[in-house]
Every structure is written in C-alpha cells, then in structure tokens.
Amino acid sequence: TRLVGSEMCIRDSYDAAGKLVEPVKPKDAPYDGVLEKPLRITGMKDFKTSLLGIYSKPRLWSAEEPNLYTLVLTLKRDGKTEEMVSSRVGFRNVVIKDSVFLVNGQPVKVKGVNRHESHPETGHYVTPEQMEEEVRMMKRANINHVRCSHYPADPYFYYLCDKYGIYVQDEANIESHGYYYGKESLSHPIEWMPAHVDRIMAMVERNKNHPCVIMWSLGNEAGPGQNFRSAEKMVKARDMSRPTHYERNNDIVDLGSNQYPSVDWTRSMAGNKDFPKPYYISEYAHNMMNAMGNLADYWEAIESSDRIMGGAIWDWVDQGLYKTLPNGEKMLCYGGDFNDHPNSGQFVFNGTILSDCTPEPGYFEVKHVYQNISTSLTDDGRISIFNKNFFTDLSPYDITWTLTENGNAVAEGRLDTPPAGPREKIVVPIPDIPQLKNRKPGVEYALRISYKLKKDRGWAKKGYELAFDQLQLPVQGDLPVFKAPAGKVSLSTDKHTVSGKDFSVQFDAATGELAQFTVNGKPLFKTPMAVNALRAASSNEPGVMAKSMACLLYTSPSPRDA
C-alpha cells in the first residue's frame, strides 16, 4: 500500500463560478476507486489544491520497468465539461539510506552519459525525432542514465525518458568556470544570488512532475560559494523527494561527486568511511576521438560497493556541424574548420555517437560494459549467469550459445535455463556439444553466450542482442612437448642466474630486469633490458596533459643499446 498525492495550481478565467473535478484513473493497474475532489473557484484568481489517495499495489516506475499512469484534470461549469488536460505520471521512491542511493528500495547503478543538445544541421535545436532516436539508442546500449549537461533539456526529452526508462540528473543552466573557483567566482557575490536561485528553481518547478528525474544538480563548474547554499535550501523547501548534487561543493548537497577520478581512486571510495555520502562520478571516461579507456576497470570498481552509484561518461554525441565542400559533399566539422579563431579544436568531438547519430566504436564498448547480464565460467567448468538487474528477471530474453573453433562457428543452440531473478546468479552445465567431446589438439575453442529480446520493445525489435559474453575454453594439450636438459639456477644478493648448455641468463635481483644474456661465452647486452612500450596517442593527450612527464613517458620511446 502506498500513499500518493498531487498538488495542482488552477487559474479560472471565467467570471461565473466553476467546478473542478480531478479523476486519476490508472491503466491496467489495481486501484481502490477513483480519486475525486470537487473545488469551487471564482474567476481571475489562482488556487492551489492537493489530492491524496491510497493505491493497494501500484506498479512502480524505474528505468527497468517504466510504468506510467494517466492523470486527467477536468474543468466543469454547471455540469458541462469546459476543458480537460492530462499528464503521464509515475510512482517511484528515491532515498539515501546508510550512504547508499536507493530507487524503490534498491541500490541501483546509474550507467550514464552526459548529453548536450546538438544537431549537425540545426545546432542546439534538436528535433523531436532525433531526441527519440537518441533515447532509443541509449536503451539499446544499456545506458540507463543521462546527466543533462549543463542545462535543462527540451521538455519532450523528459517525456521520452519517462516513457522508455532513463534515470535523469536534471542540471541547472549555471556554469561560470571562466572565473574559476576562488574569490572571483560568481558563486560568492550576494548580488548574484537571485540569478543562481532563479535558474535552479525554474528547473525544479518545470520538471518536478517527471518520475525520470531522480536528482537535481545545482549547476556545473561554477564555484563553491554561498549562492549555491541559498539555492540548495530553496530546492529542499520545495522538493524533499529527490537528492541534490553539485560537484564543486559536496558539503552542501546530498551526493558526493567529482570528475575524472582514477580507477584506483574510484575503488578507494568503496571503503572510505570518512565520506558519508553516496558517490557519483559526474564526468569520467573522457571520449575525445580514440579515447574512453579503462571503462571495464572503472565498472569493476563501481560494482565493488553499493555506495558507488555509477557515473556519466563525457559525453554522448559529437557536437559537429555540417560544412558543404566544393564538390557538394557534406563533412562534419569542428573548431577551426569554419576559419573561426580562437577555437577549441576537436574538443567538441567527445561523443559516443557521431553528430549524425551514427554509433562510434566506443558505443559498442559502452554497450558491453554497461550490460546487465554477466556470464563466466566456474572453476569446475560450468556456466555462471548473473542477472545484474534490480527489478526484472531474465524471462524477456532468448539465451543461445555458439561454439567457435579458431574463430569459426561450428555449432549453436539454445541454452535452457530457469530465468534468473533480480540480482540472482545461477549456474548451469555446458551443453552437450559433440565438437567439445572430440576437441582437436592445439585448436582454440570459445563458447559465445547471447541474450536476445523475445518480443518487440519500444526501443528495439524482437531478436535484438542486448548482452553477450565469450567464454574461452581450455586448449587440448596433446601437442608434443619439447624436451631439454635441466638447467641450473644460482641466487645471489644482486643477481639471479639461470644457466644451461652453452648459455646463461642473468636477472637483476632488485629490479627484475633481464641484465645479461650470454651464449657460448659471448655477452649479448651492453645494458640491461627495460620495458620500452609505445602505443598510439589518444586525443585526450596533445593539450595540457601532453606536457606532463607522465604522459611523455608513454608516448616517446627512447633507444637502448643491445
């Protein structure tokens, strides 16, 4: 049983007395009667009224199960309907308990992206069609959270998030980091307080009825001062049902947060008892061009503790604009391509999808890391399936397997298992596959487990693969083994030596470096060998980061004598 309520503001433009009746009729859900409250109002005045009632078993809204009801307001005069308006509403509960962020009592993980409103032809105006396609693409990539960076989104976007199931952090249109965060910050002068409070409260009033909005963000990178303290108090006076977030001053809000922590730092928050708040990463995995590294490592750390809520990748969509070339073709361009100076170069190309909503390679990495089903092999060679969902079982999925032999599919079939419940782990045997009984020596076998939708969803068709894992099977060990005479090992305080017929190898006892390799009495090295690795630079590095010695060590190999 759950107590539900509604607060309404009504203005009657008629001179004569009218009558207001507000029925709330849920669709396809148990409900004890129809809530109805007549109210007589006189013309040209504003009234506020509230409506309370009890549901026996309401279907709660979550990103996994976005159950919605329809609220209908009817204005009548002398028994005749003058006007009707309706709105979709959802019932869900957001609380913080014991430093854990809970939605409907469960410690959900927010698997998110930061989203700017951007279209390659219309700029910051985004069509309703693109908004819907973006949300559907998010759902297909297992993204369940959006941080509206760094301003409230188009009203239609919240409607879509209510409908499809996306947890939203709504963020006020405040950013002044050009002044940085010291005494010059606009967050300090009292004359700037009304501007801060007005923008934040306008966001709260406009979007407070959306179940998808599960937290308020006071702004982004705008200093820690008293103006945000005043605004936070105003938010709490208006809405106690959602926690607040502000990365630049964790002390005044409900959530703890920072930007771009290391994986180790993220992992350390799991056991940090001196930090008494849920931990949320407002920006991480900066995805400029070929970046977004360590995403799986981040999520190993995030999933190590209920106190770590999750986070939002920077960011969702490239903010490029089309430029028509002399040959008539269109090219997605960024800073400097329009002869604009100064500019920020490719800094607007941080997306998980291209400006035209084409998935980038990172999109598929996000989809796999964010997936809500994990499959692995147990030590005794069985298949372990973990349902990471908090509210739904695995009955909506067809589970299939494919056996590959050196990468080529040789067998496939269905994996019949009981549907794992929310947060449940089940273990099943590997299917009886003839090719596994007669494995070829030295051949690499892998079992791919796939989870596909049994039915159409609003964001994907039947048969769409939402999750998969590839399980590496042991290689058959029947290859001939090379036989060599036993060697000799000698240990000293400064070096360890392995020797055999006509050779010896020395390792530095302190560093582990390969110090010398001698063959037939002839030393081959002038200096000890050391790791000298080179990788392609990421687009995150050429700016300020590339000036740090730590970065140069990775990108600039040095020659060694050998």
Kindly give the residue locations of the regions a language model identified:
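Intrinsically disordered, low-complexity Pro/Gly/Ser/Thr-rich segments with frequent PxxP/GP/PP motifs
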Residues: 32-49, 54, 408-439
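Catalytic cores of secreted or luminal carbohydrate-active enzymes
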Residues: 328-377, 388-396, 437-477, 524-526
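Extended acidic/polar, glycine-enriched regions
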Residues: 7, 11-95, 453, 457, ...
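Substrate-binding/catalytic cleft of secreted carbohydrate-active enzymes
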Residues: 135-141, 145-350, 354, 361
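Beta-strand/loop-rich accessory regions of lumenal/periplasmic or secreted enzymes
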Residues: 62, 430-442, 455-457, 470-556, ...
